[in-house]
């Protein structure tokens, strides 16, 4: 749920299929975003109430959230605004996976996404996206163990994202404990992202 300066409107949630709280991303854990001006098209500028063509930076964390208690309040607010009709997802970058999943469980999401370093972003510092992060294969096992230890397997879904490129990657993620996978970059490239089709 973005800041109001990025055009967030709680009424839009009534139209949503789900609400994802973006806590982190595997290829830039703990860092904010950097959206290059060339990607701030007129359409993006209008949607986010930003000037077109100007670089945009986003903070590493939402300024309204200081910890899991604040996030739990926001999740409850979203559930109330949607009469509990849309699933709540938390997206975590693979860092301190076991501890982060245990903390995320306290916010009562429907699913937790673990994003490994193999994923990509169009809004991160080059050094971070190329040289940092935890491989997703290791992250899946840690996340599953955290859910198992808390007795939350089957109650909170574990979704893996980050570098899924083919059926073999899907099979490995499921075998290691993911309930589902999410594909971002690969599907965007298949659709010729950011270009007229």
Question: What are the residue ranges of the model-derived segments?
Answer:
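A generic local secondary-structure boundary/capping motif
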Residues: 6-12, 101
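Phenylalanine-focused residue identity feature
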Residues: 8, 21-22, 98
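Acidic (Asp/Glu)-rich catalytic clusters
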Residues: 11-16, 105-106
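Mobile "lid/hinge" segments at catalytic clefts and subdomain interfaces of large enzymes
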Residues: 15-52, 177, 187-189, 195
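Signature of multi-pass transmembrane helix bundles
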Residues: 16, 33-43, 48-51, 60-69, ...
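Glycine-rich phosphate/ribose-binding loops and adjacent secondary-structure elements
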Residues: 62-197
């Amino acid at each position: 749920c973005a800041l109001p300066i990025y055009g967030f409107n709680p009424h839009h949630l009534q139209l949503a299929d789900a609400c994802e709280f973006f806590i982190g991303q595997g290829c830039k854990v703990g860092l904010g975003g950097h959206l290059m001006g060339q990607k701030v098209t007129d359409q993006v500028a209008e949607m986010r109430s930003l000037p077109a063509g100007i670089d945009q930076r986003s903070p590493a964390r939402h300024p309204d959230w200081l910890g899991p208690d604040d996030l739990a309040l926001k999740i409850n607010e979203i559930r109330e605004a949607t009469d509990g009709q849309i699933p709540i997802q938390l997206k975590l970058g693979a860092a301190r996976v076991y501890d982060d999943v245990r903390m995320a469980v306290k916010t009562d999401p429907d699913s937790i996404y673990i994003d490994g370093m193999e994923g990509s972003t169009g809004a991160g510092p080059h050094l971070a996206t190329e040289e940092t992060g935890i491989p997703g294969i290791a992250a899946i096992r840690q996340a599953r163990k955290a859910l198992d230890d808390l007795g939350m397997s089957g109650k909170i879904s574990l979704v893996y994202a980050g570098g899924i490129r083919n059926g073999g990657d899907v099979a490995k993620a499921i075998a290691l404990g993911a309930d589902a996978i999410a594909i971002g970059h690969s599907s965007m490239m298949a659709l010729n992202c950011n270009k007229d089709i």
